[in-house]
């Protein structure tokens, strides 16, 4: 199939100029998801495929019709690919993401539809343990939730000093210096919750840095381990520090939550951190490369029933 040069785009405006028709969006998806843009049946990858006159394809072995949307987050959606591309761009390439309210205004859909679209996109960035971290690795946790002082007197949480944030959701982070970050929403910050993700995600040859929290007490038994004693005002000791992951919490997570999303529920929080991690992990590539990477992740589909279950 003849290849198309889609050019470069570095803003939402130029994105819409490049993808000014639905056909161009389809061709772009085919170029990214199918090798050499040659159609592959989602029902039988070994089958011969026939091209129909209406833009659909037919799988010879199963007799089923399909298009590039099948098997992606765009499957079953009545929203045009142009609007989907805009949503993907804003969620992944915009500095702090975009709220469902603003997205609904931008692409003229209901807030409910925009909310569903953004969560489908975040679900596509679901994190796994396949890519192991090595070298110098920082560990830390953050807590997401409103400030206790801002709550009505009868809704204030008791006993929420130190790490006993009973009113907040804990999120653990694992960051490889000069590389990527991995985040997981956990039930609490005990060693039983923090240790398994570390063992799964970090190679035993790595050197780990964290603060003095007892939730990491088993780490020295497996890894070369250095502690930064924040409790005594020590934040850097030679190469021992957790400043990188703390900067990630502030610049990529808290700015988006406080500035755009305002409130994030525990139920959906992991998806938001999928989004934050994706932006951080693609921080050194161009905007159109980041967009292309986002499209490559769009091979899964979150249903509305699962989202709201």
Q: Model segments located where?
A:
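Residue-level recognition of single "structural anchor" positions
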Residues: 1-309
């Amino acid at each position: 199939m003849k290849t198309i040069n889609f050019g470069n785009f570095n803003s939402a405006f130029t994105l819409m100029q490049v993808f000014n028709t639905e056909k161009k969006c389809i061709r772009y998806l085919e170029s990214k998801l199918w090798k050499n843009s040659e159609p592959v049946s989602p029902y039988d990858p070994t089958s011969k495929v026939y091209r129909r006159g209406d833009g659909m394809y037919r799988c010879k072995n199963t007799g089923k019709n399909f298009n590039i949307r099948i098997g992606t987050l765009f499957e079953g959606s009545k929203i045009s690919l142009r609007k989907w591309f805009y949503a993907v761009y804003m969620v992944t390439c915009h500095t702090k993401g975009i709220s469902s309210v603003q997205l609904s205004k931008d692409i003229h859909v209901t807030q409910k539809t925009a909310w569903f679209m953004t969560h489908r996109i975040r679900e596509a960035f679901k994190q796994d343990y396949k890519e192991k971290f090595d070298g110098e690795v920082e560990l830390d946790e953050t807590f997401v939730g409103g400030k206790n002082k801002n709550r009505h007197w009868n809704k204030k949480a008791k006993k929420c000093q130190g790490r006993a944030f009973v009113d907040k959701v804990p999120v653990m982070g694992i960051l490889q210096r000069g590389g990527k970050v991995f985040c997981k929403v956990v039930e609490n910050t005990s060693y039983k919750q923090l240790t398994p993700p570390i063992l799964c995600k970090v190679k035993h040859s790595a050197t780990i840095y964290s603060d003095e929290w007892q939730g990491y007490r088993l780490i020295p038994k497996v890894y070369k381990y250095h502690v930064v004693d924040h409790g005594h005002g020590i934040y850097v000791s030679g190469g021992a520090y957790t400043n990188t992951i703390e900067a990630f919490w502030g610049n990529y997570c808290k700015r988006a939550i406080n500035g755009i999303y305002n409130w994030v529920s525990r139920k959906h929080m992991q998806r938001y951190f999928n989004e934050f991690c994706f932006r951080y992990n693609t921080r050194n590539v161009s905007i159109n490369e980041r967009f292309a990477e986002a499209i490559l992740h769009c091979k899964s589909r979150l249903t509305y029933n699962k989202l709201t279950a």
